[in-house]
């Protein structure tokens, strides 16, 4: 392979030439559709935003969860779905929709491991949005653990998450 020579001085003028154009995930191109919701996450490098996508397909009510998620995050998805099943009448969701369709929840950037309870409210909102076909504003982001009774519990990393929201121009 051919090597290119670069100046050893890194500055704003040559950083893109050396490293390439930065990849920004501060915005999601198809975020204003039912079932797609913005969440806030804590990482070892600070706060970040993530997107939860939900989809339905014909089936028997099976739940699939993808995106390199850990055990706690998968449990949050199960809790979200069980809350919806228990409260389908109050949410104006037909129970038939839940039993005659498979539900898929995906958190993009599958190469990045993700875990923790704080995406629970985002998963719940994504599913309710999908089932009711009501879109969630793209400039709305959320974080919080949910319980089977629908309570939102406090989570950590709030300062970092707020800074991530600000970087993503979420008010």
Task: State the predicted function of each range.
Residues 4-15, 19-38, 44-171:
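Peripheral, non-AAA+ core regions of ATP-driven protein-machinery
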């Amino acid at each position: 392979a051919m090597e290119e020579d670069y100046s050893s001085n890194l500055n704003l003028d040559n950083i893109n030439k050396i490293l390439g154009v930065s990849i920004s995930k501060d915005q999601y191109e198809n975020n204003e559709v039912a079932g797609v919701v913005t969440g806030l996450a804590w990482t070892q490098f600070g706060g970040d935003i993530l997107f939860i996508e939900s989809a339905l397909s014909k089936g028997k009510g099976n739940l699939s969860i993808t995106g390199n998620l850990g055990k706690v995050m998968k449990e949050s998805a199960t809790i979200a779905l069980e809350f919806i099943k228990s409260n389908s009448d109050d949410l104006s969701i037909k129970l038939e929709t839940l039993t005659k369709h498979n539900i898929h929840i995906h958190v993009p950037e599958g190469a990045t491991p993700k875990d923790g309870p704080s995406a629970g409210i985002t998963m719940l909102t994504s599913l309710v949005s999908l089932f009711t076909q009501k879109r969630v504003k793209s400039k709305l982001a959320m974080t919080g653990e949910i319980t089977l009774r629908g309570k939102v519990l406090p989570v950590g990393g709030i300062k970092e998450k707020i800074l991530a929201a600000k970087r993503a121009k979420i008010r």
